């Protein structure tokens, strides 16, 4: 791909830097407006290496070298670092971290919406240790609230916004041990509808956890693995519909029904587009499955009608899944789609009254390197072969994961396989069935009112405090 022809001229770089300097100087007038609206974009597993790779991919999808491009999040004026550790884990999981950036307190791994006094899977440590989230603070302040995710709506990230649960895996009562049910613990799907009964917009996957056991799925009638899971016989979707129909509530399960809604006539929306997680963006059926950008657009159109403003949590949740599976291509394309959603939200909001924050819960053992030349195809090979085993290697590698593979006792020669395939497993140094999270700090990008409060190296649980202060909600009313 080479590089733009003006780059050898010092003037090009000096002019660019001076323009950037002008922008930086304009930031000396801080935006101290009150934030009417709050949007948090959470890229699950979107560490800095993932952000950089997504930037390059975004440019290359447009036929450019990629490195010089800008993601939407790159344009945000304020950037901080977030320390992601959980109270009991150096390398964090998505549940304890979600409790931090949504509820404002650090917590143990595997737990959502409870303090560190609660112990994972120990039902009797729930009561008295519940902590509320910024979603609740916003609702209490009269704002509309929404959750949009590409995972199950009762997955770790969204669940910390409304649930108090000592185990992130208690998706429905089917996944709970008997002692937890007897102790009166509620599964996460139930809590979605009962704890904050009037969440205005809920979109994502997770249909099967809402229906009685063996209820056939509407989209996959011939596949028992997608059938309902609930042992208590409740149909949570029907209960929601019965409760909300007269309040301009609509339930949808496919893209056509979603996009045929008139958002000015919808007050409550429940969209469950898959039995579990939504498909990867690269594998999405563009006729039946909405993209993250499409869901975000509908959500904002509904939420912004509230004169008191709104809080919206948007999760690009499958960046994380791609990395765990060692499928670098899926992960990075997911990150690019989340960036598109950030751009869509930008077109629909104003920095004068909307604070937008983009961050990750944790990183991954994902890296790219190998002295690749400018414009090197991001999923391509490094420019030279190994001087140890005389074989080529891809620029992208994982520290551990399912991509560890030996052929005749030696590292696989990647030139003999299709490393451009969507489901190719990038090579990993240590064999694991699932690649792990990374422990380093993650970036926090912020723009809008009081965005300058996100400015240095912070504990992750500081994020909702800064956002709440900007909107004068929660402890900062």
Curated annotation (Swiss-Prot):
It is a lipid-anchor; GPI-anchor. The keyword Metal-binding applies. Binds 1 Mg(2+) ion. It is an enzyme of class 3 (hydrolase). Glycans are attached at residues 124, 214, 413. InterPro entries: Alkaline_phosphatase, Alkaline_phosphatase_AS, Alkaline_phosphatase_core_sf. Pfam families: Alk_phosphatase. Its cofactor is Mg(2+); Zn(2+). Thermolabile. Mg(2+) binds at residues 44, 155, 157, 315. Zn(2+) 1 binds at residues 320, 324, 437. It comes from the Eukaryota. Keywords: Cell membrane, Disulfide bond, Glycoprotein, GPI-anchor, Hydrolase, Lipoprotein, Magnesium, Membrane, Metal-binding, Phosphoprotein, Zinc. Zn(2+) 2 binds at residues 44, 361-362. The keyword Mitochondrion does not apply. Homodimer. This is Alkaline phosphatase. It comes from Gadus morhua.
């Amino acid at each position: 791909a080479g590089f733009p022809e003006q780059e050898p001229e010092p003037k090009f770089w000096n002019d660019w830097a001076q323009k950037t300097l002008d922008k930086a100087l304009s930031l000396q007038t801080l935006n101290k407006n009150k934030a009417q609206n709050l949007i948090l974009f959470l890229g699950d597993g979107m560490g800095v290496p993932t952000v950089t790779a997504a930037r390059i991919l975004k440019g290359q999808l447009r036929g450019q070298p990629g490195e010089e491009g800008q993601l939407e999040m790159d344009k945000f004026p304020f950037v901080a670092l977030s320390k992601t550790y959980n109270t009991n884990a150096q390398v964090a999981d998505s549940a304890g971290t979600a409790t931090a950036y949504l509820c404002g307190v650090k917590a143990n791994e595997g737990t959502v919406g409870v303090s560190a006094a609660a112990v994972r899977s120990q039902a009797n440590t729930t009561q008295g240790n519940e902590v509320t989230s910024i979603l609740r603070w916003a609702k209490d302040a009269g704002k509309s609230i929404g959750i949009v995710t590409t995972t199950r709506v009762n997955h770790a990230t969204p669940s910390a916004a409304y649930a108090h649960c000592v185990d992130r895996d208690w998706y429905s009562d089917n996944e709970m041990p008997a002692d937890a049910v007897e102790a009166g613990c509620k599964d996460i799907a139930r809590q979605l509808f009962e704890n904050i009964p009037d969440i205005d917009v809920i979109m994502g996957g997770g249909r099967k956890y809402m229906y009685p056991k063996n209820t056939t799925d509407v989209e996959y009638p011939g596949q028992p693995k997608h059938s309902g899971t609930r042992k208590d016989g409740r149909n949570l979707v029907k209960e929601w519909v019965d409760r909300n129909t007269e309040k301009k509530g609509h339930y949808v399960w496919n893209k056509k029904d979603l996009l045929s809604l008139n958002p000015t006539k919808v007050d409550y929306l429940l969209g469950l587009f898959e039995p579990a997680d939504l498909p990867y963006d690269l594998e999405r059926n563009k006729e039946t499955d909405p993209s993250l950008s499409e869901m975000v657009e509908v959500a904002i159109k509904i939420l912004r009608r509230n004169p008191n403003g709104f809080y919206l949590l948007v999760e690009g949740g499958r960046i994380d899944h791609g990395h765990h599976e060692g499928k670098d291509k899926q992960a990075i394309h997911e990150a690019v789609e989340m960036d598109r959603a950030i751009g869509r939200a930008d077109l629909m909001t104003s920095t004068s009254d909307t604070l937008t924050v983009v961050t990750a819960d944790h990183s991954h053992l994902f890296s790219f390197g190998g002295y690749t030349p400018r414009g090197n195809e991001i999923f391509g090979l490094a420019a030279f072969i190994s001087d140890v085993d005389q074989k080529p290697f891809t620029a992208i590698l994982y520290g551990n994961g399912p991509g560890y593979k030996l052929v005749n006792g030696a590292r696989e020669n990647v030139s003999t396989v299709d490393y451009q395939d969507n489901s190719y497993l990038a090579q990993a140094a240590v064999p694991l069935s699932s690649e792990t999270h990374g422990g380093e700090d993650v970036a926090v990008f912020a723009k809008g009112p009081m965005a300058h409060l996100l400015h240095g190296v912070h504990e992750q649980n500081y994020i909702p405090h800064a956002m709440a202060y900007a909107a004068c909600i929660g402890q900062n009313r």
